[in-house]
Amino acid sequence: MPQNEYIEAHIKKHGRRLDHDERKRKREAREGHRISKDAQNLTGFRAKMFAKKRYAEKVAMKKKIREHEQSKVNGTPKEHNPEDGDALPTYLLDRQQPNSAKALSSSIKQKRLEKADKFSVPLPKVRGISEEEMFKVLKSGKRRNKSWKRMITKHTFVGEGFTRRPVKLERIIRPSALRQKKANVTHPELGVTVHLPILGVKKNPQSPMYTQLGVLTRGTIIEVNVSELGLVTAGGKVVWGKYAQITNEPDRDGCVNAVLLV
Amino acid sequence: MATLLPPPSKKQKRLAQEPKDLDLIPEDLPNVLVRFQASDTGENTGGSVRVPGAATEKQLEMLLNQLQETNDDPTPYTFSVIKGEGDEQTLIDITDNIWASILKPGHKSTEDQLTIVYTPRAVFKVKNITRSTAAIPGHGSTILTTQFAPHTSSRMVSGSGDFTARIWDCDTQTPMHTLKGHSNWVLCVAWSPDGKMIATGSMDNTICIWDAVKGTQIGKPLKGHTKWITGMSWEPLHKVKEGHVPRLASSSKDGTVRIWDIGAGTYLRTMAGHRSAVTCVKWGGIGFLYSASHDKTVKVWDPESGRLQHNLTAHGHWVNHIALSTDYALRTGGFDHDTTRKDFKASDTELRTKALEKFNKLANTSGRISERMVTASDDFTMFLWEPEKSTKPLCRMTGHQKAVNHVTFSPDGRYLASASFDNSIKLWDGRDGKFVTTFRGHVASVYQCAWSSDCRLMVSCSKDTTLKVWDVRTKKLLSDLPGHADEVFAVDWSVDGNKVASGGKDKMIRLWSH
């Protein structure tokens, strides 16, 4: 047994031999000859195994060819195949189904059935952000000698109806240019991305204070409004809030990208 | 800080100032002259009677029972008043008392003689279903259709995507028989009105007939259709000739309707007139066979000769479903809520005469046997027809905002409910097609609905995984039944009203009870 991936390591280090591609091509070109030779000469168990494998390959090939031929002949969509997909009642058979919400809801249920780890998130670890990086010190006072005011340098989510406090009392400023209301949320199983409104910041891994301030950094768990996806709970109610984790650094990209936690 | 409400606008102030109508009955209300008329036979009961103008429904009921000398065993009735003459005749329901329903809105004055049409209500009462008594696994794939037996609520059959149909014992909530024989999804099931046979139609283009008691296959699969079966309907029991087994009509995606002889295992007639897939077939009780199709037409056939009688064209898109006002009588044959007891025994002849009696009673409107039909379509509308009388529709029912998938008449033919993909169910008057109300509550497409046999309740199943029970009288949601883990495709209410069965994408049969 190889103890390490030393072959890959060697290839990485020294490259392949110069005639590697040509040798490969030649070997592939002679593949038919080798199979023919094996088919004629192998005996015993090895012959059995060889025949079995070859038979399976031929069946697969024939199936594929037939499929191609049929698709060329009628050009219609595939017949309802009993083996794959879910059965449909007669009244839904000939209808185009907008499938997304359905796939979403059933995949979520599937997940629940599998009892996947509830607390695992796509980004378990993030880089720590120091207070110096997060806050910029603002000078205030007539002589500009007071420095108790801070301004957040990261993007933030500020809830609707927020009013700034009087200047005298406002210790931490969340710049309005860095405020975000919507996030590009990706559904991991479907691979679709939707622009959804943010409902709140649930957890910033850096510190609970940042959670309170609504700071959006990589790894932050946010709640998004998924009502337009049309998900339904087991009780038949429309789901509208769901959690998502931010996957990018919003202050570098100027937008919030997140992945839905399902 | 608490939010302050804005001060009322001028309009609001003005409205608040205006005198309000009180539902008080004026004290000087004179007596009115009324005459009772039976809704089925059209005959008058008693002569003209003077009643107080404020007489309530209950009082009228007592009076009528007295006139008919059924005081010791009173029958509940609903009342409506005839307005207009001849063709413009309409019925106005008395919901509370005569004053509030008739006199105050100005339909009639106290000077007129009122002709009150009475319809007996079901004497038994189905209890509201509130809980799931069982979730029975067993099917290996999506459940596509369910139906209760016509003669008992302890048997139910379901068809599934795992190529089998199953007969369930609903008393013990266990499977009884697995009907294996198809090589593709079982799309539709139909229990014969004599309760002895079950027909299953499949995606593999065949129909199988099964013995409902033993669970064994009768004869060979019926082959003939070239595409899958979309619907089936048994011959009404009162039309079956003495000593014969009922015949079966089937519709298929291939655009034909076939009539099968079960004994011989062959088809007797092929009705090929539709230019596209046939979606639904119904065998009516007055000697017509109705079929709806994707080619926008509804065709009326004579099942004996296989000849086309009428071609009803009014829809602008696919026709999805047909319901008949007599569906309940046709489905249950000679049985009713009372004969669903275990010890009930009746010969074929008895059942047949009883079925005819029941059909005549249900189809009898103002002294004439008639069958109304309603068709639901992808053009968001429904049409009400009376094919025997005219090829023109009686009424066009508009209001849905998406395709209408399913329509059902209430067992007494008084109301009809339509389930649509626009998340709502609408209730219409089954006699003239007038809009009654909308049931909102589902958050996704409603697939099917089923009536309780006393016509007071209705259950609907939806894509949003729930069943909902609606009260027809108060026009409100009565109970919300979550439980399924995925879309619910099929629902049915048993004939005696004790159980509801549903099945769907989560592969579970669920039984519901009060």
Curated annotation (Swiss-Prot), chain A:
Motif Nuclear localization signal 2: chain residues: 51-58
Main location, first listed in the record: nucleus
Motif mapping: Nuclear localization signal 1: 11-18
Source superkingdom: Eukaryota
The UniProt record lists the keyword rRNA processing: yes
Subunit text: Component of the pre-66S ribosomal particle. Interacts with NOP7 and RRP1. Interacts with RSA4 (via WD repeats).
Protein name: Ribosome biogenesis protein NSA2
Lineage: Eukaryota, Fungi, Dikarya, Ascomycota, Saccharomycotina
